[in-house]
Amino acid sequence: MKHGLNTEFMSETTVAAAPQNNPVLLQPDNHDKKYEALFLDIDSGQIKLPMFQREFVWEKEQSAKLIDSILKGFPIGTFIFWKTREELRSYKEIGYHKLPETPKGDYVQYILDGQQRITSLYAIRKGIRISKDGVEIDYKDIFINLDYNPATDEQVVVTEKEEGKKYVSVHDVLCKPLGTFYRTYTQEMAEQVEAYKSKLTSYDFSTITIKDYPIEIACEVFSRINTGGKALTVFEIMVAKTYDETKNFDLAERFEMLRDGTDEEKECLTAARFETISESIIMQCVAAITLSAVRSRDILTIRRETFIANWEPMKAALFTAIDFIRSELRVPVSQLVPYPGVLIALAYFFHKTSNQKPSNEQVRRLEQYFYWVGLNEHYSSGTETKLAEDFNKMDAIITGKAPDYANTELQVDPKRIEETWFSTGNAYCKSILCLLAYQQPKSFDTNGVVILDNSNLKIATSRNYHHFFPKNYLEENHKDKNPNLIANITLIDGYSNKHRIGKKAPSEYLAKFATGNPSLHATLQTHLIKDAALLAAQSDDYGIFIQQRAQAIALALNVKLLS
């Protein structure tokens, strides 16, 4: 963590960086604070620890070194505060010590830089006990060595006592009357304690306060000085910005509940098997139904009350969109969705239609949109801008009109499918996998429905993905052939993939499955393996199989696109 700050960059920061109409030059305030003044502000609730900071993680030894630096007159860096009337999500306690609330309507100073140092000083002053990894740490147990010898001792302040030496607790030095030490120690040692107390309480802590900066700029300041330029995410900023204790709204907790559910609320992303949906997508869903715009700067303009009011409507629209994808499009898991951005557009659609069941015509057009997005790799760049355009497509569908698409965007060439390498991160491949999932593929051996799961679909080697012509078979028998083509991929259960097929030739394992599954021909149809492709597989002709299956896939995709 940096302990200093380039105030030049701060003085040049303007509100123009945030969504405001009239840029105003912002100027930080530099001043010193004494120990007593600093901790009086904490005890009165004026200084707070925002939750986008790390928890208190310093070891006792680090805290001892900090006190040691103060006693030796070393600089310990600058503390930076953001003074505002914004109510942010902040830590309520340090260890077992409860922090006071800020009086309603008062300014509060959030620590942007120096949280670990200030918390260390406060923990020592209060004698706080903290439980960490099952071990209790008592900050009263940081000591000044009264027999300190600069020639042999590295530090004045230590966490472990040596036999035969005199020590005094830093906590006691700060909190007990001086008379106590004159009664307990020799005159010389008591005078030492008095000198140490004076050094601590009279130390000038360098502080910079940025007052009434917009939250977006305060967060940018935090990012630049604390994380090497790594910006806080929009979600982290909105967690801080939308926190409302009176309404019991904590965005971080609400997102966890949305993802994992609770004992009272069973509907959640995990139960729907859409648990891979990120915080950023959820933020964009809120912005979509609130503003019909999803840029980061748009999200940051949403007021706390508006965001909270739109949280439940967003959830309703989101789950209606997920239900549509699962039931109408038959895509059972989020891992197969070409781009999560389609959820934002669909949530927008269902919010605008009050989550009503779409008409048959609307279903066809929404399905067309879904496949158009993936097959044209629509969100490969400029997602935020393109989503705004896609809301217009949703508006057209709502009003019974056909969205505008270029003719070339509604045609799939089977040759491209023949040549496309399989990748779980490729939207084009994912669209084909969605098509395969739509067929409700059956198990080769039993004709039972294949159960798909996000955990088995993450990477190309995951259990649900099966190379119809096994990779090991091709490597041993046809080294010149590429097994990793999308047209060679089927969705089957992991057990059959690993234990029943292995590296067998298709002709061999299909013959075995046929003895136990009299419906194997129909089973293979659910994988878009039509008669011509099946004949090629039964004669182990990989080239013809890929060609014929690519044609079957292209035909089915073109039906979706021409809805």
Can you annotate each of these PLM segments?
Residues 67, 122, 222, 343-351, ...:
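Short, amphipathic alpha-helical segments that act as regulatory/interfacial helices
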Residues 91, 218-220, 297-299, 357-358, ...:
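Short conserved micro-motifs at the rims of enzyme active sites and ligand-binding pockets
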Residues 374-465, 473:
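Intrinsically disordered, low-complexity N-proximal targeting/linker segments that flank membranes
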Residues 455-488, 505:
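Histidine-centered nuclease catalytic patch
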Residues 485-515:
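Short Cys/His-centered divalent metal-binding micro-motifs
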Residues 2-25, 270-417:
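A cross-family structural signal marking well-folded subdomains
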Residues 32, 60-64, 115, 212-215, ...:
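Conserved structured core elements
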Residues 2-293, 333-334, 366-373, 377, ...:
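Basic- and aromatic-enriched surface patches that contact anionic nucleotides/nucleic acids
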